From Swiss-Prot:
PROSITE patterns: FBOX. Gene3D superfamilies: 1.20.1280.50. Residues 1-47 form the F-box domain. Pfam families: F-box (PF00646), FBA_1 (PF07734). It comes from Arabidopsis thaliana. This is Putative F-box protein At3g10430. The lineage of its organism: Eukaryota, Viridiplantae, Streptophyta, Embryophyta, Tracheophyta.
Length: 370
């Protein structure tokens, strides 16, 4: 490769190089091409050392990827076949599972997409599925025995003719077989539809609502079972579930009236007993609301290791609220420590029909499963 550096050192450097740069470098020589394109071990080591970004889809035409540390904003066009309205996007290993409408009134479509590599795979319904529904719940993860054995979970609530109760009917899509199959996994609560689920280390997590308390519900793609892993703290109605430190959950809760925030995190999800503990609070009023408001979509956010919140959101500005600004926030216990405008739009109810302003995303070299 024309270098006097030891290959182990070169590997270490490449594993810490952004995926976007590596894709440009892979034509440098045959060895680098094989490493970046085909070496699964290298791909996953690179992924494990990659840092969180934000992904934003703008006007169905462009995808923006923002590095909140360097504040570098990369913009590229969206492939024509993906220029639709999205109402579900789930991130796992740099891959995005998306459910979208091709046109108003049509059945939704399902796709897996690597935004950096610009690769797409459409997931077709197959028996027992006839079509997808907008009311479907989705999960995205992998069998921990083989990390590249990715699976999709789909479930929806149907009435039981025998006792008229609601229960989820579940199917799994395996890329290895290219088809859906029914499974017997069940749980007896309801998913909180106001809070997006999150994929962490191959398993999917949601907030489950029960009459007296809430729980964190997980789906293990290895065992193909649902499990309640712990109670979910209950303070206020605005809630955001996320991945913390790569192997834990975070829960941001906000009081809409005062804008006060409590952030709780779990211990490692692999521990025998999992529970939340208070991480930090923010009590100042000059911080954004972490929910959608009128034409403003849901902010993207994650919890940092320095007891802070990193968010990319949209806010109305101007004398008559006539335009919006896209703003990167960093919020610590003492309040806002960073506020940078990264873009602007005219305020138009139709200009952006996304439910989310942005999504937490980690660019990767992982190919879209065939």
């Amino acid at each position: 490769m024309g270098s006097s550096l030891p290959f182990d050192l070169i590997l270490e450097i490449l594993q810490r190089t952004p995926a976007e740069s590596l894709l440009r470098f892979k034509s440098t020589c045959k060895k680098w091409y094989e490493l970046i394109s085909n070496d699964k071990r290298f791909m996953y080591k690179h992924l494990d050392k990659s840092t969180k970004r934000f992904l934003r889809i703008e006007n169905r035409e462009r995808v923006q990827i923002l590095d909140p540390v360097t504040e570098i904003l990369a913009v590229s066009t969206i492939p024509n076949e993906l220029r639709h309205k999205y109402f579900t996007l789930i991130h796992c290993d740099g891959l995005m599972l998306g459910m979208c409408y091709e046109e108003l009134g049509s059945d939704p479509n399902l796709a897996v997409w690597n935004p950096v590599m610009r690769k797409i795979k459409w997931i077709k319904p197959s028996p027992p599925l006839v079509c997808y529904w907008g009311s479907d719940y989705l999960g995205f993860g992998y069998d921990k025995t083989f990390r590249d054995n990715y699976k999709i979970l789909r479930f929806t609530y149907l009435g039981d003719d025998d006792d008229d109760e609601s229960y989820p009917k579940c199917q799994i899509y395996e890329f290895n077989s290219g088809s859906w199959r029914s499974i017997e996994a069940k749980f007896d609560g309801e998913i909180d539809v106001e809070v997006d689920g999150v994929s962490v280390n191959g398993s999917m997590y949601w907030i489950e609502l029960q009459e007296k308390k809430n729980f964190i519900l997980s789906f293990d793609f290895s065992k193909e079972t649902f499990n309640r892993i712990c109670d979910s703290p209950l303070y206020w109605d605005i809630k955001r579930l996320g991945c913390f430190n790569g192997d834990r959950l975070s829960l941001l809760q906000q009081n809409e009236a005062t804008r006060e925030i409590h952030v709780s995190v779990t211990n490692k999800l692999s521990d025998e007993v999992v529970s939340f503990s208070r991480y930090f609070s923010v009590t100042l009023p000059d911080i954004p609301l972490f929910r959608s408001i009128d034409i403003l979509p849901l902010p993207g956010c994650f919890i940092g290791k320095n007891r802070n919140i990193i968010a990319w959101c949209e806010q109305l500005v101007g004398k008559y609220d006539d335009h919006t600004s896209i703003i990167l926030y960093e919020i610590g216990e003492g309040g806002v420590t960073k506020r940078i405008r990264t873009g602007r739009h005219e305020a138009d109810e139709d200009y952006n029909d996304l439910d989310n302003c942005s999504y937490v995303y980690v660019p990767s070299l992982i190919p879209v499963p065939e």
